[in-house]
């Protein structure tokens, strides 16, 4: 029987519910349990795919092509699992599906209501997360804060699921804040008490309370929270502010959180707590010596969460070198051919990540040109690959006005264009090439050296492709098409052997990097940047 753990939050947002859920997932996985994890988002968008990065941050893509919340990236990296489309459920997706059923007549003319129709749809998606993965445990984070109007159907659904499945199969974890009042010189439990009171008013009694705090809690404070919130003293878990996110699983384990959960749900743990690998990772992070600077040239740099997985992947790649990879954030809207050297002269490597739209594209092209001409290690992702071919066409082939048809529909040289089957599609949502696709790598190339394989799979999120009408011209002038779809039709990777390190890919390798297992291209790129630094 699959067990379900629900993680809610109170008092304020940004308490770290996602990191708490991911850390618990890691602890349970290390005890030999099969874990999956899920995020409920109360917003009415069907998914974040068409939301502005300034609103939402990064869109994280799963193997099966779901466009999801960036928290799923934390989940995958912490627990080291690959999630699926059932791991991110939005209110928009739930309501949309219920309304489609109503239009089809599935409800036989009945009145469609939040209870039971919306709550039943939510519960169905809860169960699908477990069924689709055959998990021992499903951990579900409820977005928002207890008492938010938009979260109420989700709270009601997880209340009902306890009766549906039995108390022994369901557990509630509530994250709260323990603020420190400087004038009084003490921490206050009242916000936690009121948050739990609000949750209990909605029919949920938490089994565990995870308290976010700046300072170490006294036993008296824990006892007080336990008394007023009606839980066991050992079920009050302190989560202190940490210099590294990787400390959190160790903090929770030190307070036996995994043991409490295993006992409460009667789980069959195969191993005792074993966090040696995680401790080694944390020791590595805390002993980094020296830095490697990567210039990230993008249009959304004012909200760094827009590139969260890219930055995490760069950090992962620095760990084997015992180096801290520092990102220099460069707004491509500010860059041009005249000032590009001012922005990039002190970086060890240049990365142009994915993106959409014409704005600030010329600044990215200027950065790519600088990298190519000055032999600075270059790594392009998605749009960063597309613009690499555009820059090469303009400045090596001399095709003046060459561009992507997405960014300039009237370009005389559409180096990047839509596939014929995409040209009649008008909707933006869910119409990209999404998810895990195979790539065939050409032997005796940098790509082959990096992966040490001919056949790989990586995650994608794009609509436009390299236009094969220009492939021969670019190849004749020194660009190598080192990765393609298995049928050779779609370009997946390009490189310039003349440079020390110049590679770009159509896919998004950042979605498969792990703290203890850096993604191969990122690892090679950071190594090349380190060599460049020491030239």
From Swiss-Prot:
Allosterically activated by GTP, when glutamine is the substrate; GTP has no effect on the reaction when ammonia is the substrate. The allosteric effector GTP functions by stabilizing the protein conformation that binds the tetrahedral intermediate(s) formed during glutamine hydrolysis. Inhibited by the product CTP, via allosteric rather than competitive inhibition. It is an enzyme of class 6 (ligase). It comes from the Bacteria. Catalyzes the ATP-dependent amination of UTP to CTP with either L-glutamine or ammonia as the source of nitrogen. Regulates intracellular CTP levels through interactions with the four ribonucleotide triphosphates. Residues 1-267 are annotated as: Amidoligase domain. The gene is pyrG. InterPro entries: Class_I_gatase-like (IPR029062), CTP_synthase (IPR004468), CTP_synthase_N (IPR017456), GATASE (IPR017926), GATase1_CTP_Synthase (IPR033828), P-loop_NTPase (IPR027417). Its EC number is 6.3.4.2. CTP binds at residues 13, 148-150, 188-193, 224. One of its GO terms (biological process) is pyrimidine nucleobase biosynthetic process. It comes from Staphylococcus haemolyticus (strain JCSC1435). One of its GO terms (molecular function) is CTP synthase activity. This is CTP synthase. It catalyses: UTP + L-glutamine + ATP + H2O = CTP + L-glutamate + ADP + phosphate + 2 H(+); L-glutamine + H2O = L-glutamate + NH4(+); UTP + NH4(+) + ATP = CTP + ADP + phosphate + 2 H(+). Homotetramer. UTP binds at residues 13, 188-193, 224. Gene3D superfamilies: 3.40.50.880, P-loop containing nucleotide triphosphate hydrolases. ATP binds at residues 14-19, 71, 240-242. Keywords: ATP-binding, Glutamine amidotransferase, Ligase, Magnesium, Metal-binding, Nucleotide-binding, Pyrimidine biosynthesis.
């Amino acid at each position: 029987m699959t067990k379900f753990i629900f993680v809610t939050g109170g008092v304020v947002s940004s308490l770290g519910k996602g990191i708490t859920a991911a850390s618990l997932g890691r602890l349970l996985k290390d005890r030999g349990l099969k874990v999956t994890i899920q995020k409920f988002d109360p917003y009415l968008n069907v998914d974040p795919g068409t939301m502005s990065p300034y609103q939402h941050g990064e869109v994280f893509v799963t193997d099966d092509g779901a466009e999801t919340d960036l928290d799923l990236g934390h989940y995958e990296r912490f627990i080291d699992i690959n999630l699926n489309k059932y791991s991110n459920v939005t209110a928009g997706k739930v309501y949309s599906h219920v309304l489609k059923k109503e239009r089809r007549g599935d409800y036989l003319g009945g009145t469609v209501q939040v209870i039971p129709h919306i709550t039943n749809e939510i519960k169905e998606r809860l169960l699908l997360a477990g069924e689709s993965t055959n998990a021992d445990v499903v951990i579900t984070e409820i977005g928002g804060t207890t008492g938010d109007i938009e979260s109420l159907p989700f709270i009601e659904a997880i209340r009902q699921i306890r009766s549906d499945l039995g108390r022994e199969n369901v557990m509630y974890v509530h994250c709260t804040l323990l603020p420190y009042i400087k004038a009084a010189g003490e921490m206050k439990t009242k916000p936690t008490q009121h948050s739990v009171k609000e949750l209990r008013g909605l029919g949920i009694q938490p089994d565990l309370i995870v308290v976010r705090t700046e300072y170490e809690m006294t036993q008296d404070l824990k006892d007080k929270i336990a008394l007023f919130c009606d839980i066991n003293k050992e079920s009050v878990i302190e989560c202190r502010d940490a210099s590294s996110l990787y400390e959190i699983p160790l903090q929770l384990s030190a307070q036996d959180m995994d043991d409490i959960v295993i006992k409460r749900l009667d789980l069959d743990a195969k191993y005792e707590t074993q966090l040696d690998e995680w401790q080694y990772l944390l020791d590595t992070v805390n002993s980094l010596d020296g830095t490697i600077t990567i210039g990230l040239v993008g249009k959304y740099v004012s909200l760094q969460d827009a590139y969260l997985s890219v930055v995490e992947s760069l950090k992962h790649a620095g760990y084997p070198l015992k180096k801290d990879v520092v990102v220099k954030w460069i707004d491509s809207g500010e860059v041009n051919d005249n000032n590009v050297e001012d922005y990039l002269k002190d970086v060890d490597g240049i990365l142009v990540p994915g993106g959409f739209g014409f704005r600030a594209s010329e600044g990215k092209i200027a950065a790519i040109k600088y990298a190519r001409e000055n032999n600075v290690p270059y790594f392009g992702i998605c749009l960063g690959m597309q613009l690499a071919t555009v820059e090469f066409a303009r400045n090596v082939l001399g095709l003046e006005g060459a561009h992507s048809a997405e960014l300039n529909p009237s370009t005389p040289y559409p180096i990047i264009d839509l596939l014929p089957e995409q040209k009649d599609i008008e909707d933006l949502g869910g119409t990209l090439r999404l998810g895990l696709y195979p790539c065939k790598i050409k032997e005796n190339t940098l790509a082959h050296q990096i992966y040490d394989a001919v056949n790989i799979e990586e995650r994608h999120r794009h609509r436009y492709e390299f236009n094969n009408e220009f492939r021969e011209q670019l190849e004749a002038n020194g660009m190598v098409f080192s990765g393609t779809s298995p049928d050779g039709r779609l370009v997946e990777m390009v490189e310039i052997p003349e440079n020390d390190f110049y590679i770009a890919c159509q896919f998004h390798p950042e979605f498969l990097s792990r703290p203890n297992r850096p993604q191969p291209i990122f690892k090679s790129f950071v190594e090349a940047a380190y060599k460049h630094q020491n030239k």
